Amino acid sequence: MDTTIIEKRICLYSKFLDSNYEQHILNKANQDTKNECSQKYGFIIHILKIIDIIDHEINRVNADNVFTVKFEAETLKPEPDKIFRGSVCMIYKDGVFINVLDKQKILIPAYTLTDDYDFNQEKHIYVGKDDTDNIIKEGTVLSVKITASQYNNLNFSCFGTIV
């Protein structure tokens, strides 16, 4: 995961303009960005802190307060050569899917596994060629290096290799 500085507009009802307004803005920003994914930042996992409140205006339609806020956030952006840890969530003869933080699934194609692993069709697991105790099964935690990623329809599609 990375730490990224993001600038965003946050709407806040007037009832939240009290002595804890910064905490209310932080809570609303976390709520608004939950499950958000953009090509620029990737997945916003959690907003850590507000760095600056740049601007404030009142919406003419509904009188909500609109703040332009710069904040620091933990992000997950799957780009080539980045390494992530995740657990195996699906195994097929054609490859393995790794789930990273319940946000991103990464496909490890079978051709990247064939030098080190054999697929056991009966048990749906990959078994190490040199070490039969080295098993890839659902729930196994692995480190994965992204080899390719593409952003489309508010999500990333990723390929990777085990590191």
Regions found by a protein language model. Give the residues of each.
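Single-stranded RNA-binding regions, centering on S1/OB-family and related RNA-binding modules
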Residues: 1-163
